[in-house]
């Protein structure tokens, strides 16, 4: 028994003096492992009389429990010290000023296009896209634009050759849709268009959204109602809107749409009209059976009016001071 007591005292003293978790595990193996010192004491059972065995066995088990308890407490203590040291080393000074997180934001032109798509999507219009390099049939001929119309001039259009050009409007998407799909049709076609112009209110590339509805018994009153609701929704105001007679080769009758600005002056925002019968014929649609209306708007112009931007070129200069205002 004295030998067992001595082994337990050695184990407890060694555990208490250990400052390393790895060393503690080695002590556990030395005393409690399969070949450990306390485990070896059980081998002495064979030398004891039957009367001595119960008391000795109980003493060995108590020794194991005492050493195991001391080991567990020491391990917990050392782990707590390690955590405390780690927290001190990794402490955060909450009094330091925060660092700004620069989140991205949508470009104002993208915001405007999404707003337009959302409104017309709720009315059942689908979004269609088409090529930006266009042929003269889809860009001019099918739209009832005559060979000598000013829009075909070199100073207005970027030509690759006399038959191929950068599109000047997204109307070509409408022509392609009418060629491939049968009425009734209800589409909008957002996209980039190109014209040879550059000043405070014009850029060589800009964005346009055009709309088309073709079905039976379509009339101008429907067009007025939809555009009136759109403008009020887009500007989030009960705007005064007027339709002013105008001329476009691809619509008849045609109109330009103005809204009353805060300065008391009328501002032009889009063009529209009933689809010209010649346009319907060019894509194989019978104008005696079907009619339709079309409209087109410059996205940058609408963005300028909505956000109070004075120079259209600001949208393309990538000035972060300007763009961060729209986050």
Curated annotation (Swiss-Prot):
Domain of life of the organism encoding this protein: Bacteria
Keywords carried by this UniProt record: Aminoacyl-tRNA synthetase, ATP-binding, Cytoplasm, Ligase, Magnesium, Metal-binding, Nucleotide-binding, Protein biosynthesis
Main location: cytoplasm
Compartments where found: Cytoplasm
Gene Ontology CC terms: cytoplasm
Top-level enzyme category: ligase
Coiled-coil features, chain-numbered ranges: none
GO molecular function: ATP binding; magnesium ion binding; phenylalanine-tRNA ligase activity; tRNA binding
GO BP term, pick one: phenylalanyl-tRNA aminoacylation
Catalytic activity, EC: 6.1.1.20
UniProt cross-references to Pfam families, sorted A to Z: Phe_tRNA-synt_N, tRNA-synt_2d
Free-text comment on the cofactor: Binds 2 magnesium ions per tetramer.
Catalytic activity: tRNA(Phe) + L-phenylalanine + ATP = L-phenylalanyl-tRNA(Phe) + AMP + diphosphate + H(+)
Cofactor(s) required for function per UniProt: Mg(2+)
Amino acids binding Mg(2+): 252
Subunit structure: Tetramer of two alpha and two beta subunits.
Similarity comment: Belongs to the class-II aminoacyl-tRNA synthetase family. Phe-tRNA synthetase alpha subunit type 1 subfamily.
Protein name: Phenylalanine--tRNA ligase alpha subunit
Gene of this entry: pheS
């Amino acid at each position: 028994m004295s030998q067992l007591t001595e082994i337990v005292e050695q184990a407890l003293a060694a555990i208490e003096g250990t400052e390393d978790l790895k060393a503690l595990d080695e002590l556990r193996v030395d005393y409690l492992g399969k070949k450990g010192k306390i485990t070896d004491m059980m081998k002495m059972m064979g030398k004891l009389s039957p009367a001595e065995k119960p008391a000795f066995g109980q003493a060995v088990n108590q020794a194991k429990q005492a050493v195991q308890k001391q080991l567990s407490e020491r391990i917990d203590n050392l782990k707590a010290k390690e955590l405390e040291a780690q927290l001190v080393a990794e402490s955060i000074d909450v009094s330091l000023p925060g660092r700004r997180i620069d989140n991205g934001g949508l470009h104002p032109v993208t915001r405007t296009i999404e707003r337009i798509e959302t409104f017309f999507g709720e009315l059942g219009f689908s979004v269609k896209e088409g090529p930006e390099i266009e042929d003269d049939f889809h860009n001019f001929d099918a739209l009832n634009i005559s060979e000598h119309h000013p829009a075909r001039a070199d100073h207005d259009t970027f030509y690759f050759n006399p038959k191929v050009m950068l599109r000047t409007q997204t109307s070509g998407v409408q022509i392609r849709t009418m060629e491939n799909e049968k009425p009734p049709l209800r589409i909008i076609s957002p996209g980039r268009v190109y014209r040879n112009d550059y000043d405070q209110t014009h850029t060589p590339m800009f964005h346009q959204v055009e709309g088309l509805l073709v079905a039976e018994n379509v009339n101008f009153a429907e067009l007025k109602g939809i555009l009136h609701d759109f403008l009020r929704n887009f500007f989030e105001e009960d705007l005064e809107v007027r339709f002013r007679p105008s001329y476009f080769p691809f619509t008849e009758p045609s109109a330009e749409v103005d809204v009353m600005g805060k300065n008391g002056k009328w501002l032009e925002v889009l063009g529209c009209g009933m689809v010209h019968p010649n346009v319907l014929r060019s894509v194989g649609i019978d104008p005696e059976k079907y009619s339709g209306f079309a409209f087109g708007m410059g996205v940058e112009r609408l963005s300028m009016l909505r956000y109070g931007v004075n120079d259209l070129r600001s949208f393309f200069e990538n000035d972060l001071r300007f763009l961060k205002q729209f986050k």
